[in-house]
């Protein structure tokens, strides 16, 4: 019983992993460009980084490998470190100027 | 096993400094120990490189060339720490600055010591995350935090691209090592090389991906700019060299993408630099222009152009770090804003600093006695040898365009009348003088005797 449900839930076609991964990467990059709130930008960043993990898992299922999943573990740890640093910077920005939107942090004109 | 000693010394040293800082929060002590740790690791790495040690186990592949690069990275780090301690003291920045520099150099050193994409990623991110932190290290300074956030967002985008590129790479080749692979006309492999190239183009601030560069370099404390604009480039271009030797040549015409990004970067950086009023931003755009030169150098896998690009990156690091360090010494004066008008008649206030900055700028133009000329000449000859006349001619035009804005700053320093009611005093302590002189000597020495550096590069580079 459980096995049949599990086999139905598993993705049958490996290419669906890549499609999902690309959609998430696209949403992440799009969100980084259009969203104004700093925390939302950080969330979009995490989404883009995590889409990489899905692609790796899909490839490992396709090729019966393990390297990709280990790479995915690396990416998870890096995403956590990046989120920690990003939140720290947002906190200090907010503390110095009460800024929480991108249109408020335009002192430097790249 | 001995090949690992430089990294082990640095790692232990960083942990020791973090603990020591709790008990003895003194900039002089931490700075001196940081300098010492980094210098010892650097000298050891160069010594082992000349002895030809290698370590090829686990996922690491440390050969003589990567030991040489480690040595250059650590020695340059120690020079920058040596000459930036007094700046950090005058700006009252956080004490962590010293060991974030060491962490960045450790990350770069891990990055150059492996051919596995996962290990490269971990080293790259150790360096990058430490860089985001060190950009925002100026206490109570809003601009520094803003620059740090912008750098973080675009830098992490590069990480995402690196990850997706590695996913394609493992999909096409079933392994993560950057070694000779045989795949023909494989779309997944072409996408992998594209994404990996985009990730590194973002990190080295090549033109369509350069938007973080001027902001991050302007907002960071100036000695940190001296560090992040130079030392990481050595590590990044070492990885781009790996990609250029194993991955780029496989896809047809991929070298044109690298070359065209280089050309865009060169012209964009060098032309927009003319419009800048701030000397610090001007040097930031100059580094975008230089990213263009280096990518053009890697656009063909020709032994001459590739080895002279690595040579050029190293001597460019010395010249740019020196120029930014002169700026940092000037900035210790409270009213200094890096506006061009501040530089009027600098030679009257401080002949040494004005002369040093002028010499560094001449070096960046690439005028013969300086080492950068040798690098430029080598890239040009290599491009001509591999019949890439299009890129060779554009390379020369781009370099000539670049001369103008460096000369503009020199004209401001030597030939403009000083602004009235200007009574700023420039203090210059012994450490600053020694640090700047060391960079000057390096730029001159490698210009007059380029074979000292070039022989090591040529000996080790193609036998990895």
Swiss-Prot record, chain A:
Catalytic reaction equation(s): a quinone + NADH + 5 H(+)(in) = a quinol + NAD(+) + 4 H(+)(out)
Coiled coil: none
Membrane topology: Multi-pass membrane protein
Main subcellular location: membrane
Keyword Transmembrane: yes
Residue spans crossing the bilayer: 14-34, 39-59, 70-90
Keywords: Cell inner membrane, Cell membrane, Membrane, NAD, Quinone, Translocase, Transmembrane, Transmembrane helix, Transport, Ubiquinone
Single annotated GO MF: NADH:ubiquinone reductase (non-electrogenic) activity
Catalytic activity, EC: 7.1.1.-
Localization terms from the record: Cell inner membrane
GO biological process: ATP synthesis coupled electron transport
EC supergroup of this enzyme: translocase
Listed GO CC annotations: NADH dehydrogenase complex; plasma membrane
Functional summary from the UniProt entry: NDH-1 shuttles electrons from NADH, via FMN and iron-sulfur (Fe-S) centers, to quinones in the respiratory chain. The immediate electron acceptor for the enzyme in this species is believed to be ubiquinone. Couples the redox reaction to proton translocation (for every two electrons transferred, four hydrogen ions are translocated across the cytoplasmic membrane), and thus conserves the redox energy in a proton gradient.
Recorded family membership: Belongs to the complex I subunit 4L family.
Assembly with partners or alone: NDH-1 is composed of 14 different subunits. Subunits NuoA, H, J, K, L, M, N constitute the membrane sector of the complex.
Protein name (database record): NADH-quinone oxidoreductase subunit K
The species this protein was found in: Hydrogenobaculum sp. (strain Y04AAS1)
Organism ancestry: Bacteria, Pseudomonadati, Aquificota, Aquificia, Aquificales
């Amino acid at each position: 019983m459980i096995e049949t449900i599990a086999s139905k839930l598993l993705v049958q076609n490996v290419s669906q992993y890549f499609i999902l991964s690309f959609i998430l990467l696209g949403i992440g990059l799009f969100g980084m460009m259009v969203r104004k709130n700093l925390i939302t930008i950080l969330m979009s960043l995490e989404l883009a980084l995590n889409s990489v993990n899905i692609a790796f898992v899909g490839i490992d299922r396709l090729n019966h490998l393990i390297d990709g999943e280990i790479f995915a573990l690396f990416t998870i740890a890096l995403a956590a470190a990046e989120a920690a640093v990003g939140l720290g910077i947002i906190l200090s920005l907010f503390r110095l100027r009460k800024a929480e939107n991108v249109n408020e942090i335009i002192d430097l004109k790249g | 096993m001995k090949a690992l000693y430089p990294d082990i010394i640095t790692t232990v040293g960083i942990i020791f400094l973090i603990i020591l800082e709790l008990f003895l929060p003194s900039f002089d002590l931490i700075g001196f120990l940081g300098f010492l740790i980094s210098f010892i690791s650097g000298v050891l790495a160069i010594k082992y490189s000349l002895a030809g040690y290698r370590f090829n186990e686990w996922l690491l592949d440390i050969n003589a060339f990567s030991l040489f690069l480690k040595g250059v990275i650590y020695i340059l780090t120690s020079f920058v720490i040596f000459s930036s301690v007094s700046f950090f003291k005058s700006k009252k920045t956080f004490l962590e600055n010293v060991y974030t520099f060491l962490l960045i150099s450790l990350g770069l050193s891990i990055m150059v010591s492996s051919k596995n994409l996962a290990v490269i990623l971990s080293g790259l991110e150790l360096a990058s995350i430490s860089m985001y932190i060190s950009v925002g290290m100026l206490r109570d300074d809003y601009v520094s935090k803003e620059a740090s956030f912008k750098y973080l967002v675009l830098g992490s985008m590069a990480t995402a691209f690196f990850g997706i590129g590695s996913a394609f790479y493992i999909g096409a080749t079933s392994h993560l090592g950057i070694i000779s692979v045989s795949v023909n006309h494989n779309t997944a492999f072409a996408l992998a090389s594209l994404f990996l190239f985009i990730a590194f183009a973002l990190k080295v601030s090549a033109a369509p991906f350069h938007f973080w560069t001027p902001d991050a370099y302007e907002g960071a404390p100036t000695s940190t700019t001296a560090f992040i604009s130079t030392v990481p480039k050595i590590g990044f271009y070492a990885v781009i060299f790996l990609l250029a030797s194993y991955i780029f040549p496989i896809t047809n015409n991929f070298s044109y993408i690298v070359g065209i990004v280089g050309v865009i970067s060169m012209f964009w950086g060098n032309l927009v630099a003319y419009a800048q009023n701030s000397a610090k931003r001007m040097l930031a755009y100059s580094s975008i222009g230089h990213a263009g030169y280096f990518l053009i150098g890697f656009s063909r896998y020709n032994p001459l152009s590739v080895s002279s690009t690595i040579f050029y990156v190293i001597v460019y690091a010395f010249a740019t770090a020196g120029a930014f360090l002169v700026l940092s010494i000037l900035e210790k004066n409270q009213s200094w804003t890096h506006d061009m008008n501040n530089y009027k008649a600098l030679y009257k206030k401080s002949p040494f600093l004005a002369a040093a900055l002028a010499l560094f700028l001449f070096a960046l133009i690439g005028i013969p006695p300086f080492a950068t000329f040798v690098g430029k000449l080598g890239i040009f000859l290599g491009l001509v040898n591999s019949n890439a006349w299009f890129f060779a001619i554009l390379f020369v035009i781009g370099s000539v365009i670049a001369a103008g804005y460096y000369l503009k700053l020199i004209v401001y320093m030597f030939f403009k009348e000083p602004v009235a009611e200007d009574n700023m005093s420039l203090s210059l302590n012994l450490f600053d003088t020694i640090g700047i002189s060391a960079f000057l000597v390096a730029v001159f020495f490698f210009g007059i005797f380029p074979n000292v550096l070039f022989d090591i590069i040529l000996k080790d580079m193609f036998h990895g």
